[in-house]
Amino acid sequence: GIELREQPSAGSMENLKRLLDEKDDTEVALVQSGTANGVNVETLFSLGYLYYEPLWVFYRGGRELDRLTQLKGSRIAVGAEGSGTRKLALQLLEANGVGDKSAALLPLGGLTAVEALQGSKADAVFLFGSGRSSAVWSLLYAEGVRLMSLSHAEAYARLFPHLARLTLPQGAIDMTRNIPHRDVTLVSPMATLVAHESTHPALVQLLLQAAQEVHSEAGIFQRPGEFPRGGQADFPLSPDAERFYKSGKPFLQR
């Protein structure tokens, strides 16, 4: 039989380190696309993308912002040290000329970042996750907090292959309260299922069948059957995964 052991982690960067650590027995992990940029990952394979992990930039203030350059001079929570959130947030801010000399970059992420924004200890926060995550949800309903619609989203998607341009439709979160009150343009990396090269082909097939059962439904950002799908922005696609996406289940399992 097959034994599945779930291991808690701090996020994509830790997951990647575990997969690359020869002393660690982790075989498969979720890694945010773009996280592995610049890292030697020749022993790892992608099993495909599972879902979107949109970037949500929330900020305080009455003025409507739509460009990251407008955050110069602000206190920005960009994610905890070593997190995938921090790596991608700094990448986007750098592309807009925003760095530690032009803004206060706070090492805060998740609910800690939310508390900082709500407590006026931060002016803006970067969060990655679904619209149902507790951190994102709390700010979508918070008074005095705005969600940035990124006017440069298409440019980001072209400059950074690991990002996709998404639209959060007006009212998609809550039609009764009309949240959001307008269409919002976001960018999103994707959660990638990554496996070590030693992972048995039979296990790859089982993982992908399970992923298809769990992640193929429609959502706010995805169409039915859009996920899982082959993807290799950071890692080469596993030959076993490639066969699965082309032909489906092995012949003897049909």
Where do the PLM segments sit?
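Short, glycine-/small- and polar/acidic-enriched structural segments
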Residues: 2-73, 77-80
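Second-shell loop/turn segments in exported
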Residues: 3-6, 16-17, 44, 74-82, ...
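Sec-exported extracytoplasmic/periplasmic mature domains
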Residues: 2, 20-24, 94-98, 118, ...
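Bilobed "Venus flytrap"/periplasmic-binding protein-like clamshell domains
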Residues: 1, 53-115, 119
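Pocket-lining segment of extracytoplasmic ligand-binding domains
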Residues: 100-188, 199
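An extracytoplasmic/periplasmic, membrane-proximal ligand-sensing/linker region
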Residues: 108, 112, 129-138, 147, ...
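Residues embedded in well-ordered beta-strands
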Residues: 56-58, 185, 192
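Solvent-exposed, acidic/flexible segments
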Residues: 8-12, 47-51, 69, 78-86, ...
